[in-house]
Amino acid sequence: MEEIKFNQIGVSFKGSGSYVPDQILTNEEISQKVDTSDEWIKSRTGISERRISRVEDNVADMGYKAALTAIEMANWDIKTIDLIVLATSTPHDLFGSAPSIQSKLGASNAVAFDLTAACSGFLFALITTSQFLKAGNFKRALVVGADQLSSFVDWNDRRSCILFGDGAGALAIEATNEFDNFIGFDMRTDGERGCFLNLPSKNNEDSIIDNIEFLSGGFSPIQMNGQEVYKFAVKEVPIILDKLFKKTNYSSDEVDWLILHQANQRILDSVGDRLKIPREKILSNLEKYGNTSAATIPLMIDEAIRNHSIKQNDIIATSGFGAGLSWGAALIKWG
């Protein structure tokens, strides 16, 4: 593309990190609990195994470990970080896990808060954080995606228990006056279809005193209409990415890598086919980790950087999609 002189605040990508628990749950092991098989799961999802957090672990622990490796890659002084945004739907504390990550890191100068948008969460957090940096309010930021959905799965429901795993990923991003590697984005929500994928509250009626009743808090396991979610993803994700390419004056041919939320291999392949992006440009680690919700995109980015697939100045098209229903896309240049 033609070079345009840059005279605004832009975003630079400085580092990545990830963490997955050491407990591995294979398809064969799941098939001992529910009526399924390794072949059935792999043929329909592409997943062979997933990671499950130990009892003593939580989202803040995983997010901290992922963030620390991103900071090390960026070679930052932790005290220079001034913003931490955690994308999660499963905080260890209902009031938020980002402050715990801030504390564990010792990033005492950073504002820290959670953002909840399910499997779109990391992308929405990355977009939000980039806009804070471009507005000139912050200089260095960590964007973390971490989820522990194993705690909210019905392990007797073969439709959902085969899909989800735990993990965390993080990106270290920085404001710069020299260029802007956050090229563009788009975001969408359709609450009318929210019933296709949700994790609803499960409330029990109780009373404080006579005539004053309340609902005690809790949550039901994940509920999903897999067929509707599949149809939603393979239709909406190519549309939003195509619109983003047009808006940013890029073509799919200029994309080095397509990194989608790792929900289902058939979704990844279908989206790539509709955009005419070759399979070799579609990155996937779904087979090893399953759907880690807000962690999938940064986990995949970090893996691809560390195995030298993603290189400096590579163009990455990425899209998150999931509960809400929500979906979005971003176009970035690594570095």
Swiss-Prot record:
Q: Does the keyword Metal-binding apply?
A: no
Q: Where in the cell is it found?
A: Cytoplasm
Q: Does the keyword Nuclease apply?
A: no
- Which reaction equations make up its catalytic activity? malonyl-[ACP] + acetyl-CoA + H(+) = 3-oxobutanoyl-[ACP] + CO2 + CoA
Q: In which pathway does it act?
A: Lipid metabolism; fatty acid biosynthesis
Biological process terms in GO annotation: fatty acid biosynthetic process
Name the UniProt key words of this record, in alphabetical order: Acyltransferase, Cytoplasm, Fatty acid biosynthesis, Fatty acid metabolism, Lipid biosynthesis, Lipid metabolism, Multifunctional enzyme, Transferase
What does UniProt give as the signal peptide span? none
- Lineage, top-rank taxon, reads Bacteria
Annotated catalytic residues: C119, H261, N291
Q: What is its EC number?
A: 2.3.1.180
One GO cellular component assignment for this chain's record is: cytoplasm
Where mainly located?
cytoplasm
A GO term for molecular function: beta-ketoacyl-acyl-carrier-protein synthase III activity
> NCBIfam families, from UniProt?
fabH (TIGR00747), PRK09352.1 (NF006829)
Family, according to the entry, reads as follows: Belongs to the thiolase-like superfamily. FabH family.
Stated role: Catalyzes the condensation reaction of fatty acid synthesis by the addition to an acyl acceptor of two carbons from malonyl-ACP. Catalyzes the first condensation reaction which initiates fatty acid synthesis and may therefore play a role in governing the total rate of fatty acid production. Possesses both acetoacetyl-ACP synthase and acetyl transacylase activities. Its substrate specificity determines the biosynthesis of branched-chain and/or straight-chain of fatty acids.
The record's note on quaternary structure and interaction partners says: Homodimer.
PANTHER family, per database record: 3-OXOACYL-[ACYL-CARRIER-PROTEIN] SYNTHASE (PTHR43091), BETA-KETOACYL-[ACYL-CARRIER-PROTEIN] SYNTHASE III, CHLOROPLASTIC (PTHR43091:SF1)
For domains, the record's comment is:
The last Arg residue of the ACP-binding site is essential for the weak association between ACP/AcpP and FabH.
This chain belongs to the protein called Beta-ketoacyl-[acyl-carrier-protein] synthase III
Write the gene name: fabH
